[in-house]
Amino acid sequence: VERATLNGFINTDFPSFMNRGFYTIMAAQFLSSLADNALLIAAIALLTDLQAPDWMTPLLKLFFVVSYVCLAAWVGIFADSMPKGRVMFISNSLKALGCLLMLFGSHPLLAYAIVGVGAAAYSPAKYGILTELLPAEKLVVANGWIEGLTVASIILGVTLGGVLIRPDVAGGLLEIFHLEAVGLERFAQAAIFAIVFIYTFAAIVNLAIPDTGARYPKQDFRPIESLKHFWQSNLLLWRDPLGQISLS
């Protein structure tokens, strides 16, 4: 039985590289990314159904990505403030909330931005937990599995989104779940309703991720100081040859 010490923290024993915790992380990541990409297709379809101006469609992705940029200096602090499985649970719950807001009256762009906040908070947790769960020599392989699974989920998610907005599939969802009773009558809304369940399932899987036992010193929330530290770290990475490769 092997033990790993990373960043001063001793992880629990694990018998092999593919332990239960890593399988759970992969499953949660796949489901969350699958829903992210299916939602993009469904949200575009919703804008089309609502006869929104053409300029709104490209803004969907912008509203999603802007959270990564605006919150980059602080999401890492949030991810280290509690067990990362819980962080991922909160993040997926926030994504599900964004979907529900999109269904029940909120502007699609604003609702999609909330989904983006959840995605931005999710990223540092999904990568950070690997350093707590696995030994350093296994991290490259682990990240390869995560990235490969993410690529697969992107392809399948876009496909799933296209399937869910089909009239026969979406119409079936509207009928089976009696969505008209709660004011949901559009095919795109039925698709988003189904995606809420995927996010919910991903959040439930997050709860099954084992607590690695890693605890970090509590950091006071100082937005300006955190922004300065983030900027300095960013410059440091750009000056490092390997860091340049990673960022580019």
Label every model-predicted segment:
Residues 53-61:
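Juxtamembrane helix-start elements in MFS-like secondary transporters
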Residues 42-50, 102-104, 156-195:
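Transmembrane alpha-helix termini and helix-breaking/packing motifs in multi-pass membrane transporters
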Residues 21-40, 60-79, 83-95, 111-166, ...:
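Substrate-agnostic recognition of the 12-TM MFS/MFS-like secondary transporter fold
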Residues 52-53, 83-84, 135, 169, ...:
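A helix-boundary/kink motif common to multi-pass secondary transporters
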Residues 128, 132, 185-188, 192-222:
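Helix-loop junctions on the cytosolic side of multi-pass membrane transporters
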Residues 4-22, 209-247:
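Juxtamembrane intracellular "pre-TM" segments in multi-pass secondary transporters
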Residues 93-107:
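C-terminal ends and interior cores of transmembrane alpha-helices
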